[in-house]
């Protein structure tokens, strides 16, 4: 058996099924999950937590110790994977430039504990503390605090029997959620180890791995299929859950409503475009007016007209953008690319074609989202140009090999279609 995993959030049913099959031990299940899998709740402490990312439920956080990275890359084959170069709760020393491993650090402490890894380019620190999977200890006012997941008053009193004596000696103690699943004698020994670590400044081995996975539409569809083996699940369940809640439940449980209508309800007259880079950076492209749409229970096809002001150069095409120029682009839930056709606002002549290679686009309320696969194709004056191949190689550290191979496969397919004059 591999590590113990606690799973929370909208992907919990599918991920419980998957990680159970990979020989991880599932612990601290919700009542709903235990009933769905006909299991008793396994009240043991967790080594690993998998949950939705609070800032964006289209992403998953995996944190703790004991996860096998290859398992993540084999499960989420077509998603972006970011592993923090600095461990959560590790203690680091900061130089005068207030940076660490080329990341900006806030606040600029000489030494501190990492409380937020740099998934947005910045490390957030707090004062140095000793951390285990059960508790956090540091010198302070001598108080005890509790994880938000410890709410039972009897449980708090149980834990206070251990932390109050330390409070009287000037130590702060914060109990983590795992503590409520562990016997007092084990917790007492853990606190003693934390005190020694804190006083001896032995933080070298402290810290937890932290992964942030940006899910693609194909991987969400895979999770839909896994969930379907456990409970009634419609196609696009996990995508729709980012915009709807009760409507999806009603469709699945009560068979009320239409999947096609839910999908169509996400399409406004004007759609924003969320273009996600492999390193996690999000670029909001100029949105567009919906001029065509086809939607049914199996998928969607949306055509946008994006209009430009007279400023800049068309990327990859090299022609000046003039007032009134516009782009006609199709987003298709089945396609790993979008063909941008740029036209002159003066005489409607075609200026060039730019093909963006990406995961199939998701529909969220009022916007389209996809993962950009870095490599692109431009057609200018009948010449084919392969763009940013070096970027794909450089950013492949964030991609499973299956995703890199898919990007190359799509490029080869498109070049072949262009050469045969069959591009569509």
Curated annotation (Swiss-Prot):
Keywords: Endonuclease, Hydrolase, Nuclease, RNA-binding, rRNA processing. The keyword Lyase does not apply. Its EC number is 3.1.26.-. It is an enzyme of class 3 (hydrolase). Gene3D superfamilies: FomD-like. It comes from the Archaea. GO terms for molecular function: mRNA 3'-UTR AU-rich region binding; RNA endonuclease activity, producing 5'-phosphomonoesters. Pfam families: DUF402 (PF04167). PANTHER family: PTHR39159, UPF0374 PROTEIN YGAC. Probable RNase involved in rRNA stability through maturation and/or degradation of precursor rRNAs. Binds to RNA in loop regions with AU-rich sequences. Belongs to the FAU-1 family. This is Probable ribonuclease FAU-1. It comes from Saccharolobus solfataricus (strain ATCC 35092 / DSM 1617 / JCM 11322 / P2) (Sulfolobus solfataricus).
